[in-house]
């Protein structure tokens, strides 16, 4: 869509045209026409009632489209007394993103929809009108035009009523068709497309033919077209036209005119004796349809046919004949030189216009036998042998094709057994082969001989391996088969205890759910905006509760219990930079992408402009603390937009810190956030037990004591429900691995849960030390002994090695060599249990623990 600048609206003047009509009921004056005039232009634009106009909106690139229903002047308006009543159309980008899939297809480039919503405000100011457009109504079975150059032509096929797309009502369709017929300025886009499809080369040919007519033709009626040229006819003429060579161009209409005219100018064109071969192979149609270049007795037939064709076709159908420059010696040419476009993307060159005449044709026919007589006999023999070879290759390839298609077992006959008499008869009956360059002939012969040497096989060829397609579409890998279901009770429990599994209900948060639901519902019913701050430690169900509220509100909106709204969710963890939140909101709101600054400006215009928002928007901002910046402009805008009356924006923010507004926000930001706040307390052990039982309903995989143990353990530490679910899932894995009979696994006991809790709450360093070898554990004890002896938390490898040897002697173990101890030190350093200097220092490199000494002692203690 073209960019309609809204900055020029202030330099336009609007005035009424015609005498006013008084409305007796509403007591205001109505008009039938208005005019728009810009100060820097002298022209005026007149718009009448019933026309379609563009109206200034939020997006300057996509203004609103409407039909003028009434023009009137209302004295009760303070700012703009010139008013208009319109019938709105809606673009596809204005449809909510969550409902765009209801169309069921890809919308057209210039497609709009009849907006069937009586509650929408249709009273606008005349000063918001940008200009007039054309709207064409299409039947449901008509095809939407593609690639239109006129961006001010729109097409409508369906209507939109905020719920679904429907076909246009019959009365609306008839009304739009009547308006289309009344508009005389409307032109069908297909005609413009046909006109624009004409190639410039045909226009140049037309000018050349007209120039030749003015000089040589006596009758202009032969060259006048009686009907327009269609692209299909032009393509057919191109296929049957003469081959194009770089230097000479001739049109059949012009040549026929020159043949018919008795008083034509004499031109003597002499050709060289040796004709250079053409670069292209001539088609068979050219050899049979143009024998006049070789047979002088058929010149009259050519002249007669050209005369007939000139009466039927227009000069645009002029066929082009080009001859190579080295093959011509021009003695007398026309004084006028034209700029001839060369086809195929070559550079254009200035060449003289040459017209073939009967005299020239006779002279050429007379010279051809001389050239053939002067040619040596060896060339004729070579030409004959090449013709025979090509004929044999053709027969063999034809035989190979027939043998592949037929399944009958036939005996293979080589090409050498074909009789010479048959080849001579074929040579006499077939048309002469086109002249080619030696390189092209030898290349074709090599490729043909290579195919002829292949013996046909009765067994089918191997199927080719699938290759990467040329135009591959990137996509995510998908399964060919569905995922296998759970095979036992433990697998079923593991699936239900997953964090991503959606439970049937959300227990233990009924009060918080009701408070959030009432807040959002009141804003939707009042069509106003507001903010709510939700805080709580991780894993307390904040985001899950809000999702449940939105799901229930969407179901209520479908049942017409609450007004429809648009839901958008943004997570601060998924943003690379805080200002990218504008880009995400704009993309989910309108489906467009823009830079951060441009998106912020568009959103501010949408939420702060009067009458811009059509429905309420509910915005969920998760991880709000990650949107903090030095100027705090992002938080300020998110909390300031809902304060505007026209915004209809409800913002729900979620963070982990309860005192976040007072701790990191400025006063001007926290004051706009308001006092509507909610805190999610950590789960108690009874609530965690209820959550586990609700997920494990009808699945007996845990002992009652085990569930009670894990609920109390997690509630005492953090109250995180996600941590509780992860511990239970790990306990099911431990129970499944420890069971002797996989087919009949037992229940998850308290021992399994204690083991899972130890893994979950213990450090990975402690686990690594416990699972290390005896030599590695002895080396760690030597490090602790050296630290205790020196009083420092750093020692050289040589000092640690002395302590290591002493400990091995005390325990009666064979102490390792220096190299073995060096390898042990390097391995512990690779595991990041030690911080070791590079090995170039050898025994003097320093060693330091990467974990605390208490953790090492706890891991090395004997159980």
Curated annotation (Swiss-Prot):
ATP binds at residues 502, 536-544, 623, 656, 722. InterPro entries: AAA+_ATPase, AAA_lid_10, ATPase_AAA_core, BAH_dom, BAH_sf, Cdc6_C, ORC1/CDC6, P-loop_NTPase. GO terms for biological process: DNA replication initiation; mitotic DNA replication checkpoint signaling. Residues 186-261, 274-315, 401-482 are annotated as: Disordered. It is found in: Nucleus. One of its GO terms (molecular function) is ATP hydrolysis activity. The modification Phosphothreonine is found at residues 203, 340. PROSITE patterns: BAH. Residues 503-863 are annotated as: Necessary and sufficient for ORC complex assembly. The record marks 94 as: Histone H4K20me2 binding. Phosphorylated during mitosis. Keywords: Acetylation, ATP-binding, DNA replication, DNA-binding, Magnesium, Metal-binding, Nucleotide-binding, Nucleus, Phosphoprotein. GO terms for cellular component: nuclear origin of replication recognition complex. This is Origin recognition complex subunit 1. It comes from Bos taurus.
């Amino acid at each position: 869509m073209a960019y309609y600048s809204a900055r020029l609206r202030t330099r336009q003047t609007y005035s009424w045209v015609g005498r006013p009509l008084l409305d007796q009921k509403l007591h205001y004056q109505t008009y039938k026409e208005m005019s728009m005039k810009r100060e820097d232009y002298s022209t005026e634009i007149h718009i009448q009632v019933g026309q379609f106009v563009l109206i200034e909106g939020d997006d300057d690139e996509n203004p609103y489209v409407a039909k003028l229903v009434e023009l009137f002047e209302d004295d009760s308006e303070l700012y703009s007394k010139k008013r208009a009543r319109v019938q709105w159309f809606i673009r596809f980008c204005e449809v909510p993103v969550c409902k765009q899939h209801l169309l069921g297809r890809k919308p057209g480039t210039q497609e709009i929809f009849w907006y069937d919503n009586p509650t929408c405000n249709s009273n606008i100011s005349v000063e918001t009108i940008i200009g007039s457009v054309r709207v064409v109504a299409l039947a449901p079975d008509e095809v939407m035009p593609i690639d239109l150059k006129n961006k001010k032509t729109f097409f409508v096929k369906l209507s939109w009523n905020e719920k679904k797309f429907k076909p246009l009502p019959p009365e609306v369709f008839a009304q739009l068709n009547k308006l289309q017929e009344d508009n005389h300025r409307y032109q069908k886009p297909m005609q413009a497309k046909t006109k624009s499809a004409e190639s410039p080369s045909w226009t140049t040919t037309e000018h050349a033919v007209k120039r030749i007519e003015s000089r040589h033709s006596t009758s202009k009626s032969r060259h006048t077209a009686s009907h327009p040229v269609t692209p299909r006819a032009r393509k057919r003429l191109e296929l049957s036209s003469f081959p194009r060579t770089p230097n000479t161009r001739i049109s059949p209409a012009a040549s026929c005119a020159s043949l018919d005219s008795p008083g034509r100018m004499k031109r003597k064109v002499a050709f060289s004796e040796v004709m250079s071969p053409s670069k292209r192979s001539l088609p068979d149609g050219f050899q049979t349809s143009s024998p006049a270049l070789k047979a002088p007795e058929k010149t009259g037939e050519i002249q007669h046919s050209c005369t007939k064709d000139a009466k039927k076709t227009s000069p645009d159908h002029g066929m082009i004949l080009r001859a190579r420059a080295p093959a011509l010696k021009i003695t007398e040419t026309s004084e006028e030189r034209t700029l001839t476009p060369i086809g195929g993307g070559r550079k254009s060159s200035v060449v003289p216009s040459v017209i073939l005449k009967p005299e020239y044709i006779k002279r050429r026919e007379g010279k051809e036998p001389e050239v053939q007589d002067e040619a040596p006999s060896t060339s004729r023999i070579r030409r004959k042998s090449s013709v025979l070879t090509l004929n044999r290759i053709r027969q063999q390839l034809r035989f190979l094709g027939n043998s592949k298609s037929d399944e009958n077992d036939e005996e293979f006959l080589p090409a050498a057994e074909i009789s010479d008499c048959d080849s001579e008869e074929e040579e006499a009956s077939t048309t002469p082969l086109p002249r080619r360059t030696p390189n092209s002939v030898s290349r074709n012969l090599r490729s043909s001989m290579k195919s002829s040497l292949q013996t046909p096989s009765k067994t089918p060829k191997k199927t080719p391996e699938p290759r990467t397609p040329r135009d591959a579409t990137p996509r995510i890998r998908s399964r060919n088969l569905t995922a296998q279901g759970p095979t036992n009770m433990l697998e079923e429990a593991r699936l239900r205890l997953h964090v991503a599994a959606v439970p049937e209900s959300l227990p233990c948060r009924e009060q918080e759910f009701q408070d959030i639901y009432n807040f959002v519902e009141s804003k939707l019913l009042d069509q106003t905006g507001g903010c709510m701050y939700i805080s709580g430690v991780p894993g307390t169900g904040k985001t899950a509760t809000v999702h449940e509220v939105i799901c229930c509100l969407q179901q209520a909106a479908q049942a017409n219990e609450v007004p429809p709204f648009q839901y958008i969710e943004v997570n601060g963890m998924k943003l690379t930079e805080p200002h990218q939140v504008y880009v995400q909101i704009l993309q989910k709101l309108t489906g467009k992408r823009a830079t951060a600054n441009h998106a912020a400006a568009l959103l501010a215009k949408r939420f702060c402009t009067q009458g811009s928002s059509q429905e309420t928007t509910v915005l969920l901002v998760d991880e709000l603390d990650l949107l903090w910046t030095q100027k705090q402009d992002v938080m300020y805008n998110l909390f300031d937009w809902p304060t505007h009356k026209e915004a209809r924006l409800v913002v729900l923010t979620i963070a982990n810190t309860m005192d976040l507004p007072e701790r990191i926000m400025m006063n001007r930001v926290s004051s706009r956030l308001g006092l509507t706040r909610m805190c999610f307390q950590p789960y108690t052990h009874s609530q965690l037990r209820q959550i586990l039982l609700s997920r494990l309903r009808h699945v007996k995989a845990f002992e009652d004591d085990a569930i009670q143990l894990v609920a109390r353990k997690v509630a005492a530490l953090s109250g995180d429900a996600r941590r509780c679910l992860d511990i239970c899932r790990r306990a099911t894995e431990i129970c499944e691995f420890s069971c002797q009979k996989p087919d009949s696994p037992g229940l998850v006991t308290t021992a399994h849960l204690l083991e899972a809790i130890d893994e979950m709450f213990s450090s990975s360093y402690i686990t690594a030390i416990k699972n290390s070898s005896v030599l590695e554990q002895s080396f760690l004890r030597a490090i602790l002994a050296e630290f205790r002896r020196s009083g420092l938390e750093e020692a050289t490898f040589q000092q640690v090695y002395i302590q290591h040897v002493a400990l091995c002697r005390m325990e009666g173990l064979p102490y390792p060599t220096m190299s073995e101890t060096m390898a042990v030190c390097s391995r512990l350093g690779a595991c990041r249990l030690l911080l070791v200097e590079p090995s170039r220092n050898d025994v003097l490199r320093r060693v330091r623990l990467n974990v605390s000494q208490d953790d090492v002692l706890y891991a090395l203690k004997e159980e």
